[in-house]
Amino acid sequence: YKNDRRALPGLCLNSDPCAITCTANDFGFEKIFARQLEAFAKRGDTLALFSSSGNSPNLLEAISAAKKLGVSTAMFCGNGGGKCAGLADVEIIVPSNNGARVQEAHELLLHTVIEEIEANL
């Protein structure tokens, strides 16, 4: 909204409760993001993942699916990265185990990343 520029494509994988419920019921909750990636992602895309713990099975599955599809991954997490540590192409690990503080840091970091992307268009 600050800059008058062309729109950029993006998709939030947790915004469709129908897709999440259907996938969770038929394939398991751990597949809710991986299945959507299989449908929509293509080589050259980037997947941004957010977790305060880094231990979410659905994010581990999403990283695996992204790798198979040639999709770059950027992981924002706390808790030393948890089980996701070392799996993403880019990791931004907030040095805290306090979920609220990690989420607050994620919001600031996301805005900073978006500003950098816009500055480099």
Where do the protein language model's features map onto the residues?
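Glycine-rich phosphate-binding loops that contact phosphosugars or nucleotide phosphates
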Residues: 1-121
